[in-house]
From Swiss-Prot:
This is CCR4-NOT transcription complex subunit 10. The gene is Cnot10. It comes from Rattus norvegicus. Residues 183-200, 602-612 have a biased composition (Polar residues). GO terms for biological process: mRNA catabolic process; negative regulation of translation; regulatory ncRNA-mediated gene silencing. Belongs to the CNOT10 family.
Length: 744
């Protein structure tokens, strides 16, 4: 007998009294009666027969196992804690560890291990469940066909959930061969030692139906595997088979919608989701899946890809509401706080998707410009997915965005003199203009509490980035730019998870080692390099904001040493290194970093999936133009990046009292951009230079007009102390635009 797993409705159930050798006729009769009573749903009669068997053979642990499973089904599969406890006791009686499974005895004990793997699956202990399942797979030859298929389907499901699509597809090929042969391993022993367990069934009609159901399930698993691998051509072939075998059922329509989503056909994906009949779904109490929750989540992911972030947030909130309603109904049935897995069907242990939805919602809020709300979502998700370096980076980005100036100040500069002039004091001859400080103080959540407390502060951002770096594997090569914080959902029939929608296409190297990053998709080698570059850039920025110049210089140097660095991050690396060096009074080294010739490219390095996705489309199909575009980031061109370099280079020359060089850099930069695009810091630099030159009136005119004016050639022998004050650095978080405010 086996605890039936909802994803594998064909899992076999057996009753037995012991080994087939030495079994009396009375034991065989009781065993057969118990099995027939179990399959017909008469669990009371089944338990009575098992009790009689127990009286005859008190030392056979398999009778205890079957009794526990019968009790479990009698209670509508709601006593998971009791079944789990019994299985653990029996496992300790048979073997102390799974690693000891290496002999023929383990074939006889296979049903015990299978039941244990099923429970581990429902408790989301996927690694442990895979370890047990793979041990069972080693002894699959003697198993009878139905049980062998159940083991394979369980392993396939686990491989899909852990993003091991290649292993899943290999196992599906084995399953297809097993089903096509038809005979299976009929001459093997049944899992519980009763060879007469199938006597009461009528083979042909039932067998044909089971084979068709298994084939349909295989096609669905193949689609899910190909979707994970982004192998859209192979997926397209399997989608046709799914629609032929499963029709317009909700799982098949969800899978096809996911396929169209990956191809960029977002409107078609939405149309397919809307055409699914959710009302026909059996419900989460029977399957463990809340289809409404999955529906809203998938709509949110599609609208995220279409850059309709506010709509995406709306749909994710609807999904969270559905999920909370499901959890409230499930928690109402549990009256014993000591047994947290009991009081509800075992399949519903997989129903709660709160943390996956919070992850998606947090990423969406971060893109829409609500970092504090995003932080609240992600800080809750990280308590469960604490081993995901990408999630720690997102938390750091929330902290950075929450502690920087407004987007208007950063992207447009200060449009009027009101932004430059803080106040005017005195009257008449004593009238003075007080210029505003351009430093941005970190005042959010800065109340003296420990930086380890999860609040959206720059100090906590430093901790998040440190965690992210520690979670990255050491050996990495071929970095590319980090490809964003996209989220999507696995729209398969059995589970959903958040995924990065900018993951590698099917043309990525098969040899890449995958690094798990739940709930998003695992990280391939090039994605790890992209991620490391983004983490280093953020780390340098945060270190500068905290005044840790040595650490900032270290991170910036590491960033610039990456073998394949995107142009935009290389630009930031030079700026951050220069600022740290200036703070360390190493002006000459800083000037080397501020050379405009260092900037030859400002691309993000994002390789869009659209080319790969479009290659399998028919001649009459067109790719949608919306969604998955690279965001407009600052600087938008090499020219504007070099302008920033020149402004900052002029500031560095000021620190060495080389005012002529500073003035030359300033006017060269101003000539490269529109006058309205000149940042206020550049105007303040020009004011300072004119004051140094003795042109007080021209400096006042610049302040009044808030623009650069032609310099008057007058020289002053008086050299005043420089009043250089660095501006809060720009930061590399992916927002609608980078700030034009640069350090000088």
């Amino acid at each position: 007998m086996a605890a039936d797993k909802p994803a594998d409705q064909g899992a076999e159930k057996h009753e037995g009294a012991g080994q087939s050798s030495g079994v009396t006729d009375q034991e065989k009769e009781l065993s057969t009666s118990a099995f027939q009573a179990f399959t017909s749903g008469n669990y009371d009669a089944c338990l009575q027969h098992l009790a009689c068997l127990q009286d005859i053979n008190k030392d056979d642990y398999k009778i205890i196992l079957n009794t526990a499973v019968a009790e479990f089904f009698k209670n509508n599969q709601t006593t998971t804690d009791n079944l789990r406890q019994t299985l653990n006791q029996l496992k300790n009686q048979v073997h102390s560890a799974v690693e000891e499974m290496d002999g023929l005895d383990d074939v006889e004990n296979s049903m015990l291990y299978y039941n244990q793997a099923v429970i581990l699956y429902h408790l989301r202990q996927h690694t442990e469940a895979i370890a047990v399942g793979e041990k069972l797979y080693q002894f699959i030859e003697p198993f009878e066909e139905k049980f062998a298929q159940a083991v394979c389907f369980l392993l396939v499901d686990l491989y899909i959930l852990t993003h091991q699509a290649e292993k899943a597809l290999h196992l599906l090929a084995v399953l297809e061969k097993m089903i096509s042969q038809g005979s299976g391993n009929k001459n093997g022993k049944s899992e519980t030692g009763n060879n007469s367990s199938k006597d009461g069934s009528n083979p042909k009609a039932e067998s044909a139906a089971l084979i068709e159901a298994a084939k349909s399930k295989i096609h669905q698993y193949k689609v899910r595997g190909y979707i994970q691998m982004k192998s859209l051509k192979a997926c397209k072939r399997e989608i046709k088979s799914v629609m032929n075998t499963a029709g317009n059922s909700a799982p098949s329509l969800f899978l096809k919608s996911n396929f169209e989503y990956l191809r960029g056909n977002y409107r078609k994906a939405v149309k397919l989701l809307n055409s699914s009949n959710i009302a026909e779904h059996p419900g989460f109490m029977k399957t463990g899946e809340c289809l409404r929750c999955m529906f809203w989540n998938n709509l949110g992911c599609i609208h995220f890809a279409m850059s309709k972030h506010n709509l995406g947030i709306f749909y994710f909130k609807k999904a969270l509401q559905e999920n909370d309603n499901v959890c409230a109904q499930l928690s109402a049935g549990n009256t014993d706080p000591g047994k947290k897995f009991s009081g509800r069907p075992m399949c519903t242990l997989l129903a709660n998707k709160r943390y996956e939805l919070l992850y998606n919602c947090g990423i969406q809020l971060l893109h829409v410009g609500r970092p504090l709300a995003a932080f609240e979502c992600l800080v809750e998700a990280v308590q469960v997915y604490h081993a995901n370096p990408r999630l720690w980076l997102r938390l750091a980005e929330c902290c950075i965005a929450a502690n920087k100036g407004t987007s208007e100040q950063e992207t447009k500069g200060l449009p009027t003199k009101k932004g430059i002039v803080q106040s005017i004091v005195g009257q008449g001859y004593h009238r003075k203009i007080v210029l505003a400080s351009q430093s941005i103080q970190n005042t959010v959540y800065n109340d003296g509490q420990s930086s380890a407390i999860p609040v959206a502060s720059v100090e906590f951002a430093a901790i998040c980035l440190r965690n992210a770096l520690l979670l990255l594997p050491e050996e990495q090569q071929d970095p590319k730019q980090e490809n964003g914080s996209k989220s999507s959902s696995q729209l398969g029939g059995n589970a959903e998870s958040s995924e990065s929608s900018e993951t590698c296409s099917s043309k990525s190297h098969d040899g890449d080692k995958l690094i798990p990053a739940p709930p998003s998709s695992p990280l391939r080698k090039q994605e790890l390099e992209n991620l490391k570059c983004s983490i280093l850039a953020c780390s340098a920025y945060v270190a500068l904001a905290l005044g840790d110049n040595l650490m900032a210089l270290n991170h910036a140097d590491q960033l610039l040493q990456q073998p394949k660095l995107s142009g935009s991050l290389k630009f930031l690396g030079h700026l951050y290194a220069a600022e740290a060096l200036i703070s360390l009074d190493r002006i000459s080294d800083a000037i080397t970093h501020l050379n405009p010739e260092n900037v030859t490219d400002v691309s993000l390095g994002i390789s869009s999936n659209e080319q790969d996705q479009g290659s399998d489309k028919g001649e009459n199909e067109a790719m949608e133009s919306s969604g998955k575009r690279a965001p407009q980031c600052y600087p938008s061109s090499v020219n504007s990046a070099r302008t920033v370099m020149l402004f900052n280079l002029g500031s560095a020359y000021c620190l060495r009292s080389e005012y002529d060089k500073a003035r030359k850099c300033l006017h060269q930069a101003a000539s490269m951009i529109h006058p309205k695009e000149v940042p206020p810091e550049a105007i303040l630099l020009a004011v300072y230079l004119e004051l140094q030159n003795g042109n007080t009136q021209l400096a006042l005119q610049m302040i009044k007009r808030n623009q650069l004016l032609p310099a008057v050639k007058a020289h002053s022998d008086v050299r005043k102390k420089t009043v250089f004050q660095p501006v809060h650095p720009i930061q590399p978080i992916q927002m609608p635009a980078f700030t034009t405010v640069q350090r000088k």
